[in-house]
Structure formats: C-alpha cells, structure tokens
Amino acid sequence: MSTTTHQTEFLSWKILPARLDAAQTAWYLGFEPHEIPMLIAANLLKPLGKPARNCTKYFATETLEQLRRDEKWLARASDAIAAYWRQRNARKRSAGGRNGDGSR
C-alpha cells in the first residue's frame, strides 16, 4: 500500500484512535510527516510520555483536535517550519561559500 493510499484511508476514518503516530499526526494537522520533528524541536508539539530519540512518537488525538482548530497555533507552526528551512538554506549557502547573489 502506498503512502497516499494509507493517508486516504486514514483520513476517511470516522472515529480516530486515542493516539496517533507521527505520519498520522502530520496528515491530521495538514503537514508533511517530515515536518513533525521540526514542530517537536520548536516545542509546538509534545509527544506522549518520554520516548527515546529513536522511538516511535505518539500524540494524543484530543490535543491534536484542539491544535487543529487553533488558527494562531497553525500560523506559529507554519512559521516554525519556514524558519527551519530558512536557517538550513542559509547554512548550506554559507558552507558552500556562496554569496546571497549566487556568486562565489
């Protein structure tokens, strides 16, 4: 089953489980799965319990429902993701020795 098929099936569920994994959380909130660690690092999402770095992270559906309806939180989350990529691209440019105009 492809990711798109899993996502479509998940989004068609009428009753969600009490906890969702990172991919399901991303689909539910309207983000990409690779953006969930960025939101955790920005302290905008908190996984259940105290999972180890390499463990599967789960999130409470009840909390996600509240965040999903919070326009201010969605704006902060979107800004955090944009800031992450802005910083990462700036590091990449500075490591490559390029100036802002693309010249060396």
Range-by-range predicted roles:
Residues W27, K57-Y58, A83:
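Intrinsically disordered, low-complexity N-terminal regions enriched in serine/proline/glycine
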Residues A26, L45, G96-R98:
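Compositionally biased, low-complexity repeat tracts
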Residues A18-A23, I40-A75:
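Short helix-start
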Residues S2-L39:
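Polyanion-binding surface elements
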Residues T61-R104:
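A short, Lys/Arg-enriched interface patch at domain edges and termini
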Residues M1-S2, N54:
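A detector of low-complexity, intrinsically disordered, Ser/Thr/Gly/Pro/Ala-rich segments
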Residues H34, R53, G100-R104:
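Intrinsically disordered, low-complexity, compositionally biased regions/tails
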